[in-house]
Curated annotation (Swiss-Prot):
Keyword line: Cytoplasm, Hydrolase, Protease, Thiol protease
Function: Removes 5-oxoproline from various penultimate amino acid residues except L-proline.
Major place of residence: cytoplasm
Family: Belongs to the peptidase C15 family.
Protein name per Swiss-Prot or TrEMBL: Pyrrolidone-carboxylate peptidase
Entry's localization field: Cytoplasm
Length: 213
């Protein structure tokens, strides 16, 4: 199995992005399965385009995108991506679409196709906090999550895609009081445990992961 894992470059005034830094720490093979790593730009359109080019080149079985969700307390595995760009801030090239469709011919939303609950449980088995998330936001992370799901639906039906959000690093919150963080090695270990669950589970497990609000 080939697993393509992407991480974003820094954005929003940050000097580092734990997404790409944690992806870089992943081994080149997990349980005998090839791990292919790629950095993508925090730019509407170009982020998806770069991934599409890599997919065409390496033909992965799984695509896992990783992004920073500063303020979240744990590793969050996304359930759904929605067909809207509504950017609160500009991307790294100054784009700021508001209430625009990601894919004109796409559905309003896609349920992502990774075993999200198995991933969460395997991360937690390593004593790392994790949960299912029901929103990837409306910035670049959701843009990529939806874009990859749409590529799967329209071009690569046997490919599985999904998205993992991670917290800030400790050095990013020195001037952000009461903001959660997680060290880089722990994030990288969580990603490895998530990937193990993807390898081991063609179907998701039946455990609760929902929220009341």
């Amino acid at each position: 199995m080939k697993i393509l894992v992407s991480g974003f470059d820094p954005f929003g005034g940050e000097k580092i992005n734990p997404a790409i830094e944690s992806v870089k720490l992943l081994p080149d093979s997990i349980k005998g399965n090839e791990i292919i790593k790629i950095e993508i730009p925090t730019v509407i359109g170009k982020s998806v385009d770069k991934l599409k080019e890599k997919i065409k080149e390496v033909k992965p079985d799984v695509v896992i995108s990783v992004g920073q969700a500063g303020g979240r307390e744990d590793i969050t595995v996304e359930r759904v991506a929605i067909n809207v760009d509504d950017c609160r801030i500009k991307d790294n090239e100054g784009n700021q679409p508001i209430d625009e469709k990601i894919a004109e011919d796409g559905p309003d939303a896609y349920l992502l196709t990774l075993p999200i609950k198995a991933m969460v449980e395997n991360i937690k088995s390593a004593n790392i906090p994790a949960s299912v998330s029901n929103t990837a936001g409306t910035f670049i992370c959701n843009h990529v999550a939806y874009g990859m799901a749409h590529v799967r639906a329209t071009e690569y039906p046997n490919m599985r895609t999904g998205f993992i959000h991670i917290p800030f690093l400790p050095e990013q919150v020195l001037n952000k009081p009461h903001t959660a963080s997680m060290n880089l090695d722990t994030i990288a270990k969580a990603l490895e445990k998530a990937i193990e669950a993807v390898i081991d589970n063609d179907e998701d497990i039946k455990v609760t992961g929902g929220k009341t609000h």
